[in-house]
């Protein structure tokens, strides 16, 4: 233990405060302890490991059927009913057959039931991920030589016409598309599992909420644009790469005259019904114990009308086509394709992880329990790794379905088993009944599901008033998603977020503090009235960390606010230059901090102060450049007869100052007691006492 400065209290003696340093522990000892804890083999350790990897084995033993079962069954049935039409619809986004969406929904629910730590999150197909998967699938299909104007829901897609390069493949379009999707999914899952094993769950925190909202907005516009051709029944090429949204709109305008009247009428009716039902459901949700299964009702009615009205034969309306039943045999994803999509999987893994962890934490906070971010990464990763061998594509947590689970009384992840059972029933028996379902109806389901994300644009003005930097991140991410690509939008959002963070730390708020009346508290003299400046002492606050990027701004701020360029004046004194005085009044409070003024005094009497106190409470950390800056500043002030004191330093900052040579070398060295203080008031009182002693000594001499 080393003795820290003793704060002086008015009317009382000094209160001894001692800091207890933690026992030094090297990297070797720390790794040895972690390995010993992790690798020790016993029945209890194995049981704890299994329970950590499969949380269901822990909470199932505490399950209370009388309290939980009714809510879990109800929410599971509702989610299962919603999953079926969404799975069929989202296959349009992924460019795959509907059967693969059903596979994905089935296996993802079962795996997350075993491995997830959230009680309310619904994991399965997600529109944004389906869009990203579809973009990669379309690109690889085009590179393989398939006709990009065809899509996987078109009857006869497996026997579609190939050009020269595609003729070398051993399967058709749909077969190759699912191979690409499974390779992408396996790589995505491997990245997520690796992040979970390496305890990188904190990485998702760097994808801020404005970034995710802007990404959702931009991707939703891209999804909406991709579905317009199905709403209108227009056959246009599927554009890829930068400018896809703009090129698609131009193609739609050129082909608007070829719109299918039957699809337009169907889309108009379905959109009106779905939007009206959603608005009414949102308005009266407090009266509805169970959300209305509007999507399922619309799909059932539309399928019956299409079947008995023979809309495909009479009007050429596009339909879903054959949807097989049962399960296909497992297949190992191709390593060659995994190499091609490895980079695409990085963006997919980050987006899925960020949405899954943020949703899990959101529902955990609102319902009073905790989740483990690293286990969520493992769970979502396994929801991608294992199903990749079973003809599934990438999944993550979905907000809309998770909200429905909560609203319908979900208590545990047992509801996911009920949802998987509903999907299994469709897979085994009911899938062929959707043969005559129009694709325009599926597009309507997708478009209506984007309401929440598209409405986020109305949050932009409020976000701008609250934080312009966050608003720029939101707008930049959304614009890049729409004008370039979703992957580029994610990258742009991350870069803008990092630049925003760097900008805030590079030029933090600075101020000179003054005393609040006769109290021991100090505040910004420009923000509050009636504050009393301390004569002969300048109290400076730097509202951020001190590191290599802002050390020059730190010095400029300090010199400008105090009216004394200590570095310049100390150099002039060393060179034997002439004295210069401080301008009357010094710099105005709050004016722009440009080049440091050279009008300064060489002695404290001319400068108007004898001590500078730096309030280090906002100083989160220092690096080597920051410590060097403080050392140079102390030397320059010392050359002018001015003292430099630090107040409110946190223990980590004290340690950095000690290791950097700013303080004395030995424990208990008086240098620390002379320079570091527990409060600003202690530093000011000590500075005034020292100055009085110095004046008394000079007078005596």
UniProtKB/Swiss-Prot annotation:
Membrane topology: Multi-pass membrane protein
A Pfam family the protein falls into: STAS
SUPFAM superfamilies for the chain: SpoIIaa-like (SSF52091)
Region (Disordered): 1-20
A GO BP annotation: chloride transmembrane transport
Record's subcellular location: Cell membrane; Basolateral cell membrane
Glycosylation sites noted in the Swiss-Prot or TrEMBL record: 158, 163
A GO molecular function held by the record: solute:inorganic anion antiporter activity
Function: Sodium-independent sulfate anion transporter. Can transport other anions including bicarbonate, thiosulfate and oxalate by mediating sulfate-thiosulfate, sulfate-hydrogencarbonate and sulfate-oxalate anion exchange. Mediates oxalate-hydrogencarbonate anion exchange.
Protein name per its UniProtKB record: Sulfate anion transporter 1
Originating species: Homo sapiens (Human)
Lineage of source species: Eukaryota, Metazoa, Chordata, Craniata, Vertebrata
Gene from which the chain derives: SLC26A1
């Amino acid at each position: 233990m080393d003795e820290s400065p003793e704060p002086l209290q008015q009317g009382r003696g000094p209160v001894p405060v001692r800091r207890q340093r933690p026992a030094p522990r090297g990297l070797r000892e720390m790794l040895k302890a972690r390995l010993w804890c992790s690798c020790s083999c016993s029945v209890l350790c194995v049981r704890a490991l299994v329970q950590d990897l499969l949380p269901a084995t822990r909470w199932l033993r505490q399950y209370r059927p009388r309290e939980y079962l009714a809510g879990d069954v109800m929410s599971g049935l509702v989610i299962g009913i919603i999953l079926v039409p969404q799975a069929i619809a989202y296959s349009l986004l992924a460019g795959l057959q509907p059967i693969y969406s059903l596979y994905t929904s089935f296996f993802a629910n079962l795996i997350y039931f075993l491995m997830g730590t959230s009680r309310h999150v619904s994991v399965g197909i997600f529109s944004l991920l389906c869009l990203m998967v579809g973009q990669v699938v379309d690109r690889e299909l085009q590179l393989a030589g398939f006709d990009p104007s065809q899509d996987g829901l078109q009857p006869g897609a497996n026997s579609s016409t190939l050009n020269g390069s595609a003729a070398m493949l051993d399967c058709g379009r749909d077969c190759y598309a699912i191979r690409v999707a499974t390779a992408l999914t396996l790589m995505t899952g491997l990245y997520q599992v690796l992040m979970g094993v390496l305890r990188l769950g904190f990485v998702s925190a760097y994808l801020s909420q404005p970034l995710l909202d802007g990404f959702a907005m931009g991707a939703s516009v891209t999804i909406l644009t991709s579905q317009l051709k199905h709403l209108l029944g227009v056959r246009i090429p599927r554009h890829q790469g930068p400018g896809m949204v703009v090129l698609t709109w131009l193609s739609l305008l050129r082909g608007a005259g070829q719109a299918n009247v039957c699809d337009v009428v169907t889309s108009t009716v379905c959109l009106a019904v779905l939007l009206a039902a959603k608005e009414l459901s949102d308005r009266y949700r407090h009266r509805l114990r169970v959300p209305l299964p509007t999507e399922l009702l619309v799909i059932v009615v539309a399928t019956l009308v299409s079947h008995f009205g023979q809309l495909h034969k009479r009007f050429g309306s596009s339909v879903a086509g054959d949807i097989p039943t049962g399960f296909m045999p497992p297949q190992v994803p191709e390593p060659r394709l995994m190499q091609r999509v490895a980079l695409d999987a990085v963006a997919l893994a980050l987006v899925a992880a960020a949405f899954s962890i943020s949703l899990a934490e959101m529902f955990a906070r609102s319902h009073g329990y905790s989740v483990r971010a690293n286990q969520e990464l493992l769970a979502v990763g396994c929801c991608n790794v294992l199903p990749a061998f079973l003809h599934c594509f990438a999944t993550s947590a979905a907000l809309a379905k998770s909200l429905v689970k909560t609203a319908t009384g979900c208590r545990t992840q047992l509801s996911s088993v009920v949802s998987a059972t509903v999907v299994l029933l469709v897979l085994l028996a009911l899938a062929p009944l959707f043969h005559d379902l129009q694709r325009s109806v599926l597009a309507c389901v997708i478009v209506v599901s984007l309401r929440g994300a598209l409405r986020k644009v109305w949050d932009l003005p409020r976000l701008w008033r609250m934080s312009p930097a966050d608003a720029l991140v939101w707008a930049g991410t959304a614009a890049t998603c729409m004008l370039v690509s979703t992957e580029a939008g994610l990258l742009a959002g991350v870069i803008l977020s990092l630049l925003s963070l760097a900008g805030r730390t590079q030029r933090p708020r600075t101020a000179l503090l003054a005393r609040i009346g006769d109290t021991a508290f100090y505040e910004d003299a420009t923000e509050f009235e009636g504050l009393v400046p301390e004569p002969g002492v300048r109290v400076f606050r730097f509202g951020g960390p001190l590191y290599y990027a802002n050390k020059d701004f730190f010095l400029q701020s300090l010199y400008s606010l105090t009216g004394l360029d200590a570095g310049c004046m100390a150099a002039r004194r060393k060179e034997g230059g002439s004295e210069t005085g401080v301008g009357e009044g010094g710099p105005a409070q709050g004016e722009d901090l440009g080049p440091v003024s050279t009008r300064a005094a060489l002695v404290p009497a001319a400068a108007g102060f004898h001590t500078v106190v730096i309030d280090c409470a906002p100083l989160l950390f220092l690096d080597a450049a920051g410590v060097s800056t403080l050392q140079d500043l102390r030397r320059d002030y010392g050359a002018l007869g001015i003292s430099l004191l630090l107040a409110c330093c946190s223990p980590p900052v004290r340690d950095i100052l000690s290791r950097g040579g700013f303080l004395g070398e030995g424990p208990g060295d008086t240098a620390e007691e002379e320079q570091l203080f527990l409060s600003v008031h202690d530093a000011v009182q000590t500075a005034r006492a020292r100055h009085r002693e110095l004046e008394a000594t000079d007078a005596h001499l």
